[in-house]
């Protein structure tokens, strides 16, 4: 079992198996100075699947404890996790979309090419302004990506909507 250690709002490992298997082959996390860092979303996903364990000191954290840590830091953590999990389970590579004003950037398979989609996660009861939608679509269009809204309903089902410019 690959062991990661909690460090603020992420986890890290220096284990070469983690770097080779999770980063190089499956595109999880970010490699910085010989350490593989995973977000809490990635860590929760991998713990849930039995691929890694996360420790805080010597204590092993459960999936629920990781979820609670995520919820403390992000009110949309549950919705983001459902979308992250759904996309990963479908075989996509999912990375942070923060620098593009979205929650995720999504790659078809692996990371050999540029990401194709920017995904914005919203609970179904969210109120959207036209300006919010326009701003996100404009950014996606400007970086040649498709804008996807991932709507999470109260039954934890995810529905994806592609939002794009239409020219008449």
Curated annotation (Swiss-Prot):
It comes from the Archaea. The keyword Ligase does not apply. Gene3D superfamilies: 3.40.1350.10, tRNA intron endonuclease, N-terminal domain. SUPFAM superfamilies: tRNA-intron endonuclease catalytic domain-like, tRNA-intron endonuclease N-terminal domain-like. Its EC number is 4.6.1.16. One of its GO terms (cellular component) is cytoplasm. Transmembrane segments: none annotated. Keywords: Lyase, tRNA processing. Pfam families: tRNA_int_endo (PF01974), tRNA_int_endo_N (PF02778). GO terms for molecular function: lyase activity; nucleic acid binding; tRNA-intron endonuclease activity. The active site is at 107, 114, 145. It catalyses: pretRNA = a 3'-half-tRNA molecule with a 5'-OH end + a 5'-half-tRNA molecule with a 2',3'-cyclic phosphate end + an intron with a 2',3'-cyclic phosphate and a 5'-hydroxyl terminus. GO terms for biological process: tRNA splicing, via endonucleolytic cleavage and ligation. HAMAP family: EndA_short (MF_01833). Belongs to the tRNA-intron endonuclease family. Archaeal short subfamily. Endonuclease that removes tRNA introns. Cleaves pre-tRNA at the 5'- and 3'-splice sites to release the intron. The products are an intron and two tRNA half-molecules bearing 2',3' cyclic phosphate and 5'-OH termini. Recognizes a pseudosymmetric substrate in which 2 bulged loops of 3 bases are separated by a stem of 4 bp. Homotetramer; although the tetramer contains four active sites, only two participate in the cleavage. Therefore, it should be considered as a dimer of dimers. This is tRNA-splicing endonuclease. It comes from Thermococcus gammatolerans (strain DSM 15229 / JCM 11827 / EJ3).
């Amino acid at each position: 079992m690959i062991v990661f250690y909690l460090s603020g709002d992420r986890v890290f490992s220096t284990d070469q198996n983690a770097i080779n298997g999770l980063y190089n082959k499956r595109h999880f996390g970010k490699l910085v100075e010989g350490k593989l860092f995973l977000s809490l979303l990635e860590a929760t996903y991998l713990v849930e699947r039995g691929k890694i364990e996360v420790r805080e000191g010597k204590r092993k954290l459960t999936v629920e404890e990781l979820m609670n840590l995520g919820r403390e830091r992000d009110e949309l953590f549950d919705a983001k996790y459902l979308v992250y999990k759904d996309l990963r389970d479908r075989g996509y590579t999912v990375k942070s979309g923060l620098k593009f004003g979205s929650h995720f950037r999504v790659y078809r398979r692996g990371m050999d090419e540029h990401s194709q989609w920017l995904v914005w996660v919203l609970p179904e009861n969210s109120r959207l302004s036209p300006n919010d939608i326009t701003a996100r679509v404009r950014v996606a269009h400007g970086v040649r990506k498709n804008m996807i809204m991932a709507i999470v309903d109260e039954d934890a089902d995810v529905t994806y909507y592609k939002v794009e410019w239409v020219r008449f």
